[in-house]
Amino acid sequence: MTAIKKTITYGQHELTLETGEIARQADGAVMVSYGDTVVLVSVVGKREVKEGQDFFPLTVDYQEKTYAAGKIPGGFFKREGRPSEKETLTSRLIDRPLRPLFPEAFYNEVQVVATVMSSDPEIDADIPAIIGASAALAISGIPFYGPIGAARVGYINGEYVLNPTASQLKETALDLVVAATESAVLMVESEAKELPEDVMLGSVVYGHEQMQIVISAINELAAEVGKEPWDWAPPEPNTELIAKVEALAGADINEAYKIKSKSARSSKLDEIRSRVLGELITETTSTSEANEIKSIFHNLEAKVVRSQILNGEPRIDGRDTRTVRPISIRTGVLPRTHGSALFTRGETQALVVATLGTGRDEQIIDALQGEYADRFMLHYNMPPYATGETGRVGTPKRREIGHGRLAKRALLAVLPSQEEFGYTIRVVSEITESNGSSSMASVCGGCLSLLDAGVPLKAHVAGIAMGLIKEGNRVAVLTDILGDEDHLGDMDFKVAGTESGITALQMDIKITGITAEIMRVALSQAKEGRLHILGLMKEAVGEQPQELSEFAPRIITMKINPEKIRDVIGKGGAVIRALTEETGTTIDIEEDGTIKIGCTSAEAGEEAKKRIEAITAEVEVGQVYDGTVLKLLDFGAIVSLLPGKDGLLHISQIAHQRVNAVADFLKEGQVVKVKVLEVDDKGRVRLSAKALIEAPSAEAPEEPAVAATGADQQ
């Protein structure tokens, strides 16, 4: 049981790849250590293909164990349950660059499992997990055109930073993850603070250059301990069958792709496909042969669409390569929501709703690095009817979680700070029609709904999806791609941003040979399309946000001395409970003394604020108060000045004349005017009533006299 290790310095920490000791029954298993973050990645592939399988069943599961951070799971069962959003997003992040590197027609089931076993709070486990998956596949013998490397790139003070720590990410203007083979970038995922195109492209190139050391280390590991490659070869093309399908359907497919309506085009293609299958499938045809016919038909579709575009012919819906589909914008479409927008771009449509809440509505996330609150949520839903299909409705799928996260990244850079706008914000994008680029429609609709709700965004944000088709030296970059162009093309390239720069970038490339120059052209063309959409958005809603929705809660923010927090809360929470119940508000108090009062009416909020001010007010020397007599003593009286603030009115300070009995001048419950003479270093307050009463003349008869207010003045 000999462990083989490869250790390199990668960025600010050492990266170690270790295999041969743990999980030896997997086809490939690598323990990746990066700083104190440790991830075990295993790969298993099935040698036999399931009968009738017509797609590649790759499964990637990234899982975080709470013991990795020295924690015990919360809840009743005390064990890890369903995947968190972070686990789902990281699973997708690993899957996306791996999937294009398996051979075409390889349909054996492959499962990648990445388990976080130790978590350094400064080092995210996603980069080690991608590297581990690449290394495990490289040594497994499973057909795989890797390995790949991965890098996180930050941008701090005008400099690129390789694999920035969690602390550095708080300062960075960019958080970009790039994965690539030795020669080609495959995947980019990023969010940025309105950075220009050349900085974004430079970060991709920088990350690709830096990860070469990782790819070399994986190659060395595979050369040393790699298993015998599988005896697998792609099936020989059935030229006779291809010719038959082309003869039966080629011309008809060509005509079908001149139909601009998606539903009409799909119906026509279904009809052609059914006719071809009907003519070529007999009772003796096996499932695998039937699947081969379907695959040939699909490849023929791709050939038709790609050749039309590369030959300079109009695209499927009649556009040229740079034109954005017609756009329709409506805001305020739902009467009782806080903000809403209907964004339609061609046959893609998003109904997006913004809701404002108080601090109590923040999402509490129990992450490995510790618990934190998220004040901005964006949820993306795409029901089956959006594509004219039936299907399951309910729990969001991985794709929906990923698209929601991308749209959220795009809008984060323009949100007002907590101090500027104290609301919790939730945006929900309901995709009601889909024919390409629904996540970018969610960005546009999300921005519009936030403006409709009255959120003071720093700038308008729009998103656009780009595509690419490449055959040899012929390249076509497509603006605002359709679903078919995404499916049949070589690249899906989503860019969101403001007039000033990019806020989110996501790229998935299915082929090699995409150069930096091609990416530069795509980014430039995307900017052109983005600015066009931003112009239409501003035309529709103007530059400024609407007034805050009348249905949104009002939030009043005030600041008190942190030492007074306990006075506002009261013993056992009695004071704050009474405040919220009597005023109908919600009150959130932070450790620094910031208080946020959430209310449905301004009057209720002001009443709560007034009462908190009274509770936290300080007694000032020389000030006059209307005090209530709480208790009579032999030597004076205890007078309440403010909630929780009492003072002593000494018998000598009640009146100018001699006072033999306090009860002759005061009674409990009486309201009297008193002046604060002194507050000593222990907080004791000395009061005077006679200081507010004119001294009697020498001839005046002696009688009880004390300044009274309100009902006490008789």
Swiss-Prot record:
It is found in: Cytoplasm. The keyword Oxidoreductase does not apply. GO terms for biological process: mRNA catabolic process; RNA processing. SUPFAM superfamilies: Eukaryotic type KH-domain (KH-domain type I) (SSF54791), Nucleic acid-binding proteins (SSF50249), Ribonuclease PH domain 2-like (SSF55666), Ribosomal protein S5 domain 2-like (SSF54211). Residues 622-690 form the S1 motif domain. Its EC number is 2.7.7.8. It comes from the Bacteria. It catalyses: RNA(n+1) + phosphate = RNA(n) + a ribonucleoside 5'-diphosphate. GO terms for cellular component: cytosol. Keywords: Cytoplasm, Magnesium, Metal-binding, Nucleotidyltransferase, RNA-binding, Transferase. Its main location: cytoplasm. Mg(2+) binds at D486, D492. The keyword Cytoplasm applies. Its cofactor is Mg(2+). Residues 553-612 form the KH domain. GO terms for molecular function: 3'-5'-RNA exonuclease activity; magnesium ion binding; polyribonucleotide nucleotidyltransferase activity; RNA binding. Belongs to the polyribonucleotide nucleotidyltransferase family. HAMAP family: PNPase. Involved in mRNA degradation. Catalyzes the phosphorolysis of single-stranded polyribonucleotides processively in the 3'- to 5'-direction. This is Polyribonucleotide nucleotidyltransferase. It comes from Methylobacillus flagellatus (strain ATCC 51484 / DSM 6875 / VKM B-1610 / KT). The gene is pnp.
